[in-house]
Structure formats: C-alpha cells, structure tokens
C-alpha cells in the first residue's frame, strides 16, 4: 500500500481484533524495539454463560450456563482482576513452549499446562451490560502481555457461568490513540493522492516518557 521498502510495526493484534497497530516508516523502523509500548487500552465485547476453547466467539463451545448475573455481581467480580494479578495465558496464543507456539499445539488437539504470568491491569470499566442477554462491553486499561480473552473468561469463571470475548478493539498503544489512526483502505486512498506525509505522526509522539536513556551503540545506530 505504502510502496516503501522500510516498514516495521510495534506489537501484534489477535485475528479478530481491530484498532491501533503502530507502523514505522523509513528510518523510524530503528525505534521499533525501543518504543515504550507497555500501556494498552482495549474495548471488548463479551458474552457471559458461554465458554469456548479459544476463549472467544470464534472457538468451539465447551459449555454453557443459564445462571443469571446481575450487574452488581459483575462489577464485584471484575474488581478482583484489577492491579497486579497472575494470569494463565490461553492455549490459542503465540507464546512459545519448547520451541512450539501454543496455538500450533492447540490446533493439533493438544493442551499443555501453562504457568501463570504476572500482568498488571489498571482498570476494568463495564461500559454496557444487559442482564437479560448477559452481553456487554468493557474497557480495559492494562500493561503489555495481558490477554483480554483470559480476563473475560476468568471473570466468567469467578461468576460461576463462564464467559467469552465477542469483539476486541485496541484504542491505545505506545503513545498512539485510535483517533490518530487510519484504516488500510484510508491509507491506500491517501497514498494514491500522494499525501502520505499528511498522515505520519512524529516519532517523539510514540515516546510516553520525557526522557529515555540509551547506550552509546544504540545512539549511533539510531542516528546513522
């Protein structure tokens, strides 16, 4: 689309996810590995009462529950997952175990024990929730490495009914807000008009820290 040889990106998105994925152009690609992209903000749709093998609506249903869940109970349950917590990563993830990605093992019908990992969640806000259908939308402000699918599934398990993610949008990542982003289609149209420079964000916008310390070899690499 951009017709530029040097491109890079920071982070990845789940197959069903949309939203912010910072793309680096030209010399800015040298900063891909040092961008402080710890903070992520997501808006996720969820359905309580259904558990799947992928922890989202793309997977195979494993169990269902008719248990009613009041909003007050949901608010209470989600508060247990705010702060520093231990989270078991889903089988359908890119984490490697003995050289194999977990999703490769999962697709082969294998499930292995996963060690819980330390993650940090700043806040979980229930934006919408319908008690009749037990469907809703939540906003999660967290650090890199947090699986939103697991957050929803774990909340569902705590409520005794299970839960799955139905949609996911990343609205913030590494200093970039979704309001400053473009879709692939919009990018293609802008490039056709030869106006790429109008959509580029200065590299320093991606650094959320006022000062970052780097080694001398790294400095020389960045300015070369």
Segments and roles (model prediction):
Residues 1-13, 72-76, 135, 139, ...:
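Accessory RNA 3′-end/elbow-binding domains used by RNA modification enzymes
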Residues 93, 97-122:
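Extended alpha-helical targeting/anchoring segments
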Residues 1, 22, 112-145, 149-160:
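The conserved catalytic core of RNA pseudouridine synthases
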Residues 6-36, 104:
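Glycine/acidic-rich beta-strand-loop module
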Residues 44-46, 124, 138, 168:
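A structural signal for short, well-ordered beta-strand segments
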């Amino acid at each position: 689309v951009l017709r530029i040889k040097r491109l890079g990106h920071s982070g990845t998105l789940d197959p069903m996810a949309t939203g912010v994925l910072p793309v680096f152009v030209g010399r800015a690609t040298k900063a891909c590995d040092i961008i402080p992209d710890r903070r992520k903000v997501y808006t996720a749709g969820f359905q309580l009462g259904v558990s799947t093998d992928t922890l989202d609506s793309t997977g195979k249903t494993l169990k269902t529950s008719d248990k009613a869940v009041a909003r007050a109970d949901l608010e209470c349950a989600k508060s247990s997952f705010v702060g520093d917590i231990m989270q078991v990563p889903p089988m359908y993830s890119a984490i490697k175990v003995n050289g194999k990605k977990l999703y490769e093992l999962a697709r082969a019908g294998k499930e292995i024990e996963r060690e819980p990992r330390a993650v940090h969640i700043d806040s979980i806000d229930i934006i919408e929730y319908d008690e009749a259908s037990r469907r809703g939308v939540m906003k999660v402000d967290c650090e890199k490495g947090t699986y939103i699918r697991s957050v929803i599934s774990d909340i569902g398990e705590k409520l005794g009914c299970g839960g799955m993610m139905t949609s996911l949008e990343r609205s913030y990542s590494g200093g970039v807000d979704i309001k400053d982003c473009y879709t692939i289609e919009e990018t293609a149209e802008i490039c056709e008009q030869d106006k790429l420079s109008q959509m580029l964000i200065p590299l320093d916008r991606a650094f959320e820290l006022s000062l970052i310390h780097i080694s001398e070899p790294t400095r020389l690499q960045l300015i070369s």
